[in-house]
Amino acid sequence: MARKGLVERWKKPKKFKTREYTRCKICGRTHSVYREFGVCRVCFRKMANEGKLPGVRKATW
């Protein structure tokens, strides 16, 4: 319940630019969010394994 309230509050426009912070567009997680994709590492890995991110493939060496 608390996370849902934070996500709703996060969507509102901020009074000052410095108060904005990155959140995952899917789950609302605040830590380890990739700016390029706008999702957190957990959602990124899940989407990459499902093939939903074009051009992203698992590294092998």
Swiss-Prot record:
Keywords from UniProt, A to Z, are: Metal-binding, Ribonucleoprotein, Ribosomal protein, RNA-binding, rRNA-binding, Zinc
Disulfide bond residue pairs? none
Q: How is the cofactor bound?
A: Binds 1 zinc ion per subunit.
> What are the GO BP annotations of this UniProt entry?
translation
Gene3D superfamilies xrefs: 30s Ribosomal Protein S14, Chain N (4.10.830.10)
Superkingdom of the source species = Bacteria
A GO-annotated cellular component:
small ribosomal subunit
Name any cofactors this protein relies on. Answer: Zn(2+)
Q: Which GO terms describe its molecular function?
A: rRNA binding; structural constituent of ribosome; zinc ion binding
Q: Which residues bind Zn(2+)?
A: 24, 27, 40, 43
Which InterPro entries does the annotation name? Ribosomal_uS14, Ribosomal_uS14_bact, Ribosomal_uS14_CS, Ribosomal_uS14_sf
PANTHER family noted in UniProt: 30S RIBOSOMAL PROTEIN S14, SMALL RIBOSOMAL SUBUNIT PROTEIN US14M
- Record text on subunit structure and interactions: Part of the 30S ribosomal subunit. Contacts proteins S3 and S10.
As for family, the record states: Belongs to the universal ribosomal protein uS14 family. Zinc-binding uS14 subfamily.
Q: What does this protein do?
A: Binds 16S rRNA, required for the assembly of 30S particles and may also be responsible for determining the conformation of the 16S rRNA at the A site.
Q: What is this protein called?
A: Small ribosomal subunit protein uS14
